[in-house]
Amino acid sequence: MAVISNKNSKSHKRNRRGHIALEVPNIVLDKTTGEYTVAHHVSPKGLYKGRQVVAAPKQK
């Protein structure tokens, strides 16, 4: 049978688990297209801050 070396109290355990929370992604409205995108990321159309940075993929 396993024996723990040091017991963690309820408060220590819950304090540690307090940092395991889901974060809401930072979504911003793109002024040029009017679509919502994740901040500091290139949009699926290849735009970043209203400029064409990456060639847009061809639509089928």
UniProtKB/Swiss-Prot annotation:
GO terms for molecular function: structural constituent of ribosome. It holds the Pfam family Ribosomal_L32p. GO terms for cellular component: large ribosomal subunit. Keywords: Ribonucleoprotein, Ribosomal protein. GO terms for biological process: translation. It comes from the Bacteria. PANTHER family: 50S RIBOSOMAL PROTEIN L32, LARGE RIBOSOMAL SUBUNIT PROTEIN BL32. Belongs to the bacterial ribosomal protein bL32 family. NCBIfam families: rpmF_bact. This is Large ribosomal subunit protein bL32. It comes from Oenococcus oeni (strain ATCC BAA-331 / PSU-1). The gene is rpmF.
